[in-house]
């Protein structure tokens, strides 16, 4: 299997790709604990990868359970992300084609009329519509994050079970209807009037895990703060009208 995209948690926590050799994962974990994001990027380039997805820590599973030990302020992640993106842009300017995955997704939304298929940035939310997760026991969840929540006894986003429920019951039921109604950014408080609304989306599963309901509260929502900050930074870079930066960005989304 060829893997061209890997995901990292920058800051104080890091998860390497499961497809990488354990020795490589150990090395990347060691570098990440020191906050050496540039070294991590260099290591992926050295290994022949051309794509990295810089992610903040997600509020699911063990990451949520041990949040007090491993979490970091979202402002710290945003600062690290900008530094990482700047470094990746410089690599591209020097002739190394290398994509930052989240920026590429946002740029496609910002610069083209085409969808990305990224479930976390859809309106209404893509969970249960653009995809669903079938677990080993027949349980069906709206997303993998919903499955992770179920591991910790939160079954709110379980659509049903293939051994007990029909397709119509699961995918045309009250739960999925409520998710759709609660995740249209065009009418959500804090989203409907946001300048970035056309390029963004809702994540009811994350909102429930982080803030206790599907709608969430934008002023304290970390995903909202992170996404807006990154979009703002991308627009700042575009406003420079730098031919090299524009060429690089378009190469990421073609």
Q: Residue spans of the language-model regions?
A:
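Radical SAM enzyme [4Fe-4S]-AdoMet core and its adjacent flexible, acidic
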Residues: 2-8, 15, 20, 27-137, ...
């Amino acid at each position: 299997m060829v893997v061209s995209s890997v995901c990292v948690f920058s800051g104080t926590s890091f998860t390497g790709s499961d497809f990488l050799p354990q020795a490589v994962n150990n090395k990347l974990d060691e570098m990440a604990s020191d906050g050496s994001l540039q070294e991590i990027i260099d290591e992926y380039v050295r290994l022949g990868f051309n794509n990295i997805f810089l992610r903040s820590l997600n509020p699911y599973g063990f990451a949520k359970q041990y949040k007090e030990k491993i979490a970091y302020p979202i402002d710290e992640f945003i600062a690290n992300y900008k530094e990482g993106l700047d470094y990746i842009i410089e690599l591209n300017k020097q002739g190394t084609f290398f994509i930052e995955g989240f920026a590429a997704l946002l740029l496609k939304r910002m610069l083209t009329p085409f969808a990305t298929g990224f479930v976390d940035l859809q309106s209404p939310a893509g969970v249960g519509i653009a995809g669903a997760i079938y677990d080993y026991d027949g349980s069906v969840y709206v997303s993998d994050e919903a499955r992770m929540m179920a591991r910790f006894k939160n079954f709110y986003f379980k659509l049903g079970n293939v051994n007990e429920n029909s397709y119509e019951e699961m995918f045309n039921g009250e739960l999925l209807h409520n998710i759709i109604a609660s995740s249209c950014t065009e009418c959500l408080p804090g989203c409907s009037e946001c300048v970035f609304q056309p390029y963004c989306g809702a994540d009811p599963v994350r909102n429930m895990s982080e803030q206790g309901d599907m709608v969430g509260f934008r002023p304290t929502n970390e995903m909202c703060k992170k996404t807006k900050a990154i979009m703002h930074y991308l627009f700042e870079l575009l406003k420079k009208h730098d031919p090299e930066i524009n060429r690089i960005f378009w190469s990421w989304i073609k």
